[in-house]
Amino acid sequence: MHSQAPIQRRKSTRIYVGNVPIGDGAPIAVQSMTNTRTTDVEATVNQIKALERVGADIVRVSVPTMDAAEAFKLIKQRVNVPLVADIHFDYRIALKVAEYGVDCLRINPGNIGNEERIRMVVDCARDKNIPIRIGVNAGSLEKDLQEKYGEPTPQALLESAMRHVDHLDRLNFDQFKVSVKASDVFLAVESYRLLAKQIDQPLHLGITEAGGARSGAVKSAIGLGLLLSEGIGDTLRVSLAADPVEEIKVGFDILKSLRIRSRGINFIACPTCSRQEFDVIGTVNALEQRLEDIITPMDVSIIGCVVNGPGEALVSTLGVTGGNKKSGLYEDGVRKDRLDNNDMIDQLEARIRAKASQLDEARRIDVQQVEK
């Protein structure tokens, strides 16, 4: 499709997590978090590499102990994606992973210790050019805020976040991003809206503890979709009680749906009815699995009959319109060929791969011309 999302991004400052730019108009980064034991180096490395393969820009790793910090050192040496260390309570762990090359520290200054310990962590981060993420969560609000507000509210999450921001401001440290997560969609959305008006730093979006693969994806799509459509958000994580790989896939699907950032194929497919001339559902499911390695952005419409098929094909990179025994194949809105319905999956996979190669080559040539 050629339509552009009419979304004006919120202006924010720029930080870098490793080599990934965050904020100030940079592409919205998609991240996940490992759910292995960090001390199990092999399992953690394997999971991070699986996340890399599906396009993760950043991966967060929990580092709850010094043993985990030593494991983090080995993990960092074996992966390419930037790593965020998730640390609570023990400032010494933050200092240790900073020594081992961490790309970002996820901490709350308020639970890392007294002012001197906070200063030590911030000074270390400044010296090593390591950004910090302040992570506020409705499930772990400070006791006095729970008593003040009675329950998690947008104002409570905002007040908690601003306390931590003030900690860093007093230390003249501005290389940070902030999140204010909640499992309730409306609580999270309103909290982010309030925070976006208060600070200029990048915001990391998430609906925390969203649920299983299906319900969590729905909650995240609604909550993150609302914020992203308003231009709020610089990084995101879809939190699912599922394989972390699914978090990355859903994250990119949300961005693709809003036309904010595209990676891989955007399949447009009908829900099918008795008019379908070939197995649309089986075709789409098979192609989604077979073509996971394709990162070239393109729209592929797979429609089972001639009612909506031609119209969708006109605005797709490639489109199939169901027909009797053979279906029409469109490329860039022009009908090019007919595909045998009994061999649809193999034929369409070959055409999509060929088109992806063609688009990649065209982009490579464009880049070379710009660089000359």
Swiss-Prot record:
- Residues involved in [4Fe-4S] cluster binding: C270, C273, C305, E312
Enzyme Commission designation: 1.17.7.3
Required co-factor(s) are: [4Fe-4S] cluster
* Pathway terms, separated by semicolons: Isoprenoid biosynthesis; isopentenyl diphosphate biosynthesis via DXP pathway; isopentenyl diphosphate from 1-deoxy-D-xylulose 5-phosphate: step 5/6
Q: Which keywords has UniProt assigned to this entry? A: 4Fe-4S, Iron, Iron-sulfur, Isoprene biosynthesis, Metal-binding, Oxidoreductase
Task: Identify the Pfam families for this entry.
Answer: GcpE (PF04551)
According to its UniProt record, which reaction does this protein catalyse?
(2E)-4-hydroxy-3-methylbut-2-enyl diphosphate + oxidized [flavodoxin] + H2O + 2 H(+) = 2-C-methyl-D-erythritol 2,4-cyclic diphosphate + reduced [flavodoxin]
Q: Which GO terms describe its molecular function?
A: 4 iron, 4 sulfur cluster binding; 4-hydroxy-3-methylbut-2-en-1-yl diphosphate synthase activity (ferredoxin); 4-hydroxy-3-methylbut-2-enyl-diphosphate synthase activity (flavodoxin); iron ion binding
Extract one GO BP annotation from the record. Answer: terpenoid biosynthetic process
Query: In the record's cofactor note, how is the cofactor described as bound?
Result: Binds 1 [4Fe-4S] cluster.
InterPro entries in alphabetical order: Dihydropteroate_synth-like_sf, IspG_bac, IspG_bac-typ, NO2/SO3_Rdtase_4Fe4S_sf
NCBIfam families found in the cross-reference section: ispG_gcpE, PRK00366.1
Q: What does this protein do?
A: Converts 2C-methyl-D-erythritol 2,4-cyclodiphosphate (ME-2,4cPP) into 1-hydroxy-2-methyl-2-(E)-butenyl 4-diphosphate.
Q: Which HAMAP family match?
A: IspG
Entry's family note: Belongs to the IspG family.
Q: What is this protein identified as?
A: 4-hydroxy-3-methylbut-2-en-1-yl diphosphate synthase (flavodoxin)
Task: State the organism's lineage.
Answer: Bacteria, Pseudomonadati, Pseudomonadota, Gammaproteobacteria, Enterobacterales
Gene expressing this chain: ispG
